[in-house]
Curated annotation (Swiss-Prot):
Organism for this UniProt entry: Bacillus cytotoxicus (strain DSM 22905 / CIP 110041 / 391-98 / NVH 391-98)
PROSITE patterns: THYMIDYLATE_SYNTHASE
SUPFAM superfamilies on file: Thymidylate synthase/dCMP hydroxymethylase
Family listed: Belongs to the thymidylate synthase family. Bacterial-type ThyA subfamily.
The encoding gene: thyA
The protein's name: Thymidylate synthase
Species classification: Bacteria, Bacillati, Bacillota, Bacilli, Bacillales
Amino acid sequence: MKHAEYEYLNLCRHVMEHGTKKEDRTGTGTVSVFGYQMRFDLSKGFPLLTTKRVPFRLVASELLWFMKGDTNIRYLLQHNNNIWNEWAFKNWVESDEYKGPDMTNFGLRSQEDEAFKTQYDEQMEIFKKNVLEDDEFARKYGYLGDVYGKQWRAWKTAAGETIDQLKDVIEMIKKTPDSRRLIVSAWNPEDVPNMALPPCHTLFQFYVADGKLSCQLYQRSGDIFLGIPFNIASYSLLTHLIAHECGLAVGEFVHTIGDAHIYTNHFEQVKKQLAREPRPFPTLKLNSDVKSVFDFEMGDLTIEGYDPHPAIKAPVAV
């Protein structure tokens, strides 16, 4: 049987060979396709890619951050997770309070200008230190808007109340597992203009059959090289956690992507990854003493048997 990682590798190859060239808001440029689906049987290993190292620690701490309903990067920085830094940093350097060197277009400039990259790195360290140590600074500039965690755990209604979508869907899985309404949405049109980055993974749905829990994610926009490997692992982990609380086995993770794209400055990295052979997927171990998904901490999640090829670095488009 073909290794399940080819679901992802075939996506990479398909977009490289058949993608349409497009411009994008970051100024980097992409090749993309519209509408693509991958399927992973979670009972046959945890889909943490092996053709390059994907840091499970970062995947897990980000998911726990979402599940806490948090929208400030301080929690992530406290767990040495820097994957959301650039979007919060952008808010600071574009504010009237910022007095440092010009950081306009820092995403591209830091890749092309070594002298600028030194300045950028210095300012980023100042920013991170301030978020960690200064409560007022963290409140103003660590906040990303009403992104995933807020929509999952405290969706605002017209009546001024909030809906805990994640808690509600878990209760529905327990009480009405055959429901076709086991859905959580992160796309709130009213809040989108005020988000640092509008949700890329916009909606997910659960499905229970034969004692197994499956999850399908609809992702409006997918950065194939950097983002999608994280998304595969994150929603697979979420499925495991919810199945654990609900007393179910895991079924499939189905990943449906709208605009699936590769940035032009990731082409060489993708080619390098495609030249590698997949290795066996690892196994996820959960602390069985933890009963609620909302009580899991980093020490309760363990990956065993992960032996990937080396990491492949690539710039983030902001």
